[in-house]
Design a protein with these regions (language model features):
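Non-catalytic, glycine-rich low-complexity segments
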Residues: 30-46, 58-101, 112-116, 154-221, ...
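Accessory beta-strand-rich segments of carbohydrate-active enzymes
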Residues: 33-35, 42-45, 84, 89-191, ...
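Extended substrate-binding grooves/exosites of carbohydrate-active enzymes
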Residues: 43, 61-73, 77, 178, ...
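Short flexible loop/turn segments that cap and initiate beta-strands
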Residues: 52-55, 221-226, 239, 268-274, ...
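Short, hydrophobic beta-strand segments
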Residues: 143-145, 255-264, 693-699, 792-811
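Extended acidic/polar, glycine-enriched regions
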Residues: 148, 210-301, 695-701, 710, ...
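Beta-strand-rich structural segments
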Residues: 209-213, 228, 278, 661-665, ...
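Edge beta-strands of extracellular beta-sandwich domains
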Residues: 288-293, 713-724, 826-834
Length: 835
């Protein structure tokens, strides 16, 4: 009984401290309140909404995160173009009231944005507080000097995404990540002010905690900083306390702790400790902070690639853009979790955040699920790729933005590399690329070299020096991790490589040059930071399958009127390769640490190889709606221990037509194909460089079946049957119990099937959805890259037999019913509960 009571007290103490630090509960000197709900919103091209007296009563009332562009129609004339998703930009305004009854003169308030795209300006009581251009960075503004601490305050936020195009892909528009209202005293832990530097050695986890305390009070303060490391059983496994004299404007305090016999963070067991920091004055807690801590060892080796905790692991990664399909850019934890879990089930163990700092929720997920991360800063530096991109702001903001990315993210154990850029144009040896005067260059780089030294033959020209400057910023705030960049110029003459600032050589594509890496980059670890760029449309197959269909060059537009790309692994962009070709190189190159495939999911924008009406990508292993393409199963057969037997394509063709059937498999010696019971032959992967088997057969209605055998025994079977006339709708939710929090989602797969339940692979029926209960339809999709149907709707046309509807729970517990109907189709209703 005493042990049980002690455990209860220990758990209660931990939970109370965690709540105090994590949420900074209301009523304390320090508060951290989620401030998403109850904003007024409108598209407005002038600046009148900045005025406190502006009447916003007719504006729409909504909750954040919010992406206004995803709610609109696609159009060829939107200035973002097809690469930007053919959706509009504009200026959006958000307004909200903050009523204070604060008699404490030392209280300070800040508004924190996890992300808003882009050019965000914040006004308080008609006064401009500040502006932040970069649409992917987290930032805060101190509201204190502008507030009425007794009474009403008007917060107005302008998000200006009117200058288009400013990106090579769809970014969304608006305050698309979470917002927090922060309250503190005039002595506090700096934002992102606790840094953990860890080392695991001889069975001990050494943890150095560096904590920056800000002092805005105008006098020295005597404080105690108390820090603890907790395990998952709510036990303190390391702790320290230090009394310090905090002077203005800030003081750094360091404490060394030791975790005995630590449990290591790994892919299979991502163990997380919790670090709490309390700042006390006169025995009263005046501020606190908490974060998760993972203890591990990370190593990039020149000859053997990547090691985690001493284990040699191939990085099986994907690149992901930030949009969530039909939900747009507005962050949602359930949607993110679905994406990451689908990738993990395929065998993915790493994500490259392309090409910008991600939402904090993605990093939290990767920490908790055991997924490695390459955290990337910029897609452009001084040289722009679109007329209004980040290059316009780089000179003024790169140091602040890069610093803030590293400060925000450096305690995440999932992050194994920082990337300071993707395919930046500064790779090439063109000194005048910057368009900057020499005096500006000197200011930018703190470089006093004369103009004659900046010759084209100089190995330390502006672009190399800029690379060094960026890397130096990263190392200043995180000396523990290596630095890379995604480079599509793979010769040693690349200015980024010549700088010597990159710890890991990163190639984007150019798999044929991988063999030259040891000679060209001696002593440097190597990673394929971006690969493949295969082009596929789920459900479409172009034959013969042994012909490779490459996208023509830039000057020869791809004009296939179908706007479809083959889902055999036989279609790719001219700069890329097929999935099997690239994986074969990565798999059989020991010094290659791994790869990041472009991309895990299709994304809105960049519809290579087509233009409008195509408006989303063809690169993904999973389509925009979240339906896997066939190559998903090739990776699953190679990257996981799951038994895989995947026969494709479907079995609905013209009688007598010649059809190529492929099969991905593992854990078997051979696979035999039967058409209506008649053997079409046994196939085997003849060596370790083959990843599928295939048959060329004549179609006849009925059934195509594969039988897998190992040691002569049947270990698996799969059949594709000829579907009849579309008969009814089948609904399959990924979750049937939701949280009644206004954000919880169920992704419901919708299939058109025949009377026997076989998918009708050519079905294009329009499906209408209706809901009862406290819920709404958050979005609809079908995976088509060229459909111009709105994402925000209550109907969707099937695409190769499938579509998707996303149900979002309201804020009241409810029994939700979703009904799907279509002409000449039997409807279906499913029940979803929110509680």
């Amino acid at each position: 009984m005493r042990k049980s009571t002690f455990s209860l007290v220990r758990r209660s103490s931990f939970v109370l401290l965690l709540l105090l630090c994590l949420y900074r509960l209301e009523g304390h000197a320090f508060e951290r309140n989620l401030w998403d709900d109850g904003w007024r919103f409108a598209i407005c091209q002038d600046d009148s909404p900045q005025q406190s007296v502006f009447d916003d009563s007719a504006w729409r009332l909504l909750d954040l995160p919010h992406d206004w562009a995803i709610e609109e129609d696609f159009h060829a004339l939107h200035p973002s173009g097809a690469n930007g998703g053919a959706l509009p930009g504009g200026k959006g305004w958000y307004r909200k009231h903050l009523v204070l009854q604060d008699k404490d003169a030392s209280s300070r308030y800040a508004l924190h944005f996890d992300g808003a795209y882009m050019n965000t300006s914040v006004y308080v009581n008609s006064q401009l507080v500040g502006t932040r251009p970069y649409g992917f960075i987290s930032f805060s503004f101190d509201l204190t000097p502008y507030l009425n601490k007794q009474g009403d305050n008007v917060i107005a936020v302008k998000v200006d995404n009117s200058q288009q195009p400013n990106s090579r892909w769809y970014t969304g528009c608006g305050i698309y990540r979470h917002v927090y209202l922060m309250k503190s005293t005039d002595v506090r832990i700096a934002q992102w002010g606790v840094q953990a530097i860890t080392e695991v050695k001889k069975g001990v986890g050494n943890v150095m905690l560096n904590t920056q305390i800000e002092n805005l009070s105008g006098r020295n303060r005597r404080l105690i900083v108390r820090q603890k490391v907790w395990n998952k059983n709510h036990e303190v496994v390391a702790q320290g306390s230090k009394a310090i004299n905090v002077v203005a404007p800030a003081t750094m305090v360091s404490q060394q702790m030791r975790v005995q016999k630590p449990k290591l963070w790994s892919l299979s067991s991502p163990y997380l400790y919790t670090v709490t920091t309390e700042v006390l004055e006169n025995n009263r807690v005046i501020d606190c902070d908490t974060f998760n801590l993972g203890l591990h060892t990370v190593k990039f080796d020149v000859q053997k690639g990547f090691f985690l905790n001493g284990e040699n692991i191939k990085i099986n990664g994907v690149c992901l853009h930030g949009d969530l399909g039909c939900l747009g850019a507005a962050i949602n934890e359930d949607a993110l979790h679905r994406q990451v879990k689908m990738m993990m089930e395929m065998g993915v163990n790493a994500i490259r955040c392309s090409h910008n700092p991600p939402a904090p929720e993605l990093l939290n997920l990767c920490d908790s699920l055991g997924v490695l991360v390459v955290d990337e800063s910029f897609d452009s530096w001084l040289q722009g790729k679109t007329p209004y991109d980040y290059s316009l702001y780089f000179k003024s903001w790169f140091e602040r933005d890069l610093r803030d990315m590293v400060l925000r993210d450096r305690n995440h154990p999932s992050i194994i590399l920082w990337s300071i850029g993707n395919e930046v144009l500064e790779q090439w040896n063109k000194v005048n690329n910057s368009g900057m005067a020499l005096e500006d260059v000197n200011i930018l780089l703190n470089n006093t070299r004369d103009k004659s030294a900046l010759s084209q033959g100089d190995t330390l020209n502006l672009n190399s020096k800029l690379t060094q400057a960026l890397a130096a910023i990263v190392r200043r705030y995180d000396p523990t991790r290596m630095i890379t960049a995604g480079c599509n110029e793979v010769s040693p003459n690349n200015n980024l490589f010549k700088s010597g600032a990159l710890d890991v050589i990163g190639f984007n594509y150019h798999q044929k040059k991988v063999k030259d890496v040891p000679q060209n980059f001696p002593g440097k670890p190597f990673l394929m930071t971006e690969t493949v760029s295969a082009l596929q449309t789920r459900g479409y197959y172009k034959m013969p399958s042994d012909s490779l269909f490459r996208m023509p060059g830039k000057k020869r537009p791809f004009t296939d009127p179908t706007f479809l790309c083959s889902s055999y692994d036989n279609s790719c962009a001219y700069w890329g390769s097929t999935h099997e070709q690239t994986w074969d190189v990565v798999k059989h190159t020991p010094y290659c640490a791994g790869q990041f495939i472009w991309t895990g999911f299709d994304y809105i924008g960049e519809p290579t190889p087509f233009n409008f009406p195509a408006r989303s990508s063809y690169f993904g292993i999973v389509d925009l709606a979240g339906f896997p393409k066939d190559c998903y199963y090739m990776y699953q057969s190679e990257w996981t221990d799951k038994p895989v037997l995947h026969l494709f394509p479907h079995w609905n063709w013209i009688e007598g037509q010649t059809i190529d059937l492929w099969c991905y498999y593992n854990q078997a010696d051979e696979v035999e194909l039967f058409i209506n019971g008649k053997s079409q032959g046994v196939r085997q992967k003849r060596n370790d460089h083959e990843y599928h088997v295939a048959w060329r057969v004549t179609f006849e209605p009925g059934e195509a079946r594969v039988v897998a055998r190992k040691n002569g025994k049947v270990v698996g079977e799969q059949a594709r049957k000829t579907a009849g006339t579309p008969h009814h709708i089948r609904l399959t939710p990924n979750r049937q119990v939701l949280k009644a929090n206004g954000r919880s989602l169920s992704f419901v797969s919708v299939e058109v099937v025949d009377k026997d339940g076989n998918l009708c692979p050519w079905a294009e029926n329009n499906i209408h959805f209706s809901l009862s209960g406290d819920a709404k339809i958050a979005g609809v999709d079908n995976g088509s890259p060229f459909s111009l149907e709105r994402f925000q709707a209550n109907e969707r046309r099937a695409f190769f037999g499938k579509c998707l509807v996303v149900v979002q729970a309201g804020k009241k517990p409810s029994n939700i019913q979703l009904t799907a109907k279509g002409v000449d189709l039997a409807p279906q209703t499913i029940n979803i509960k929110s509680e």
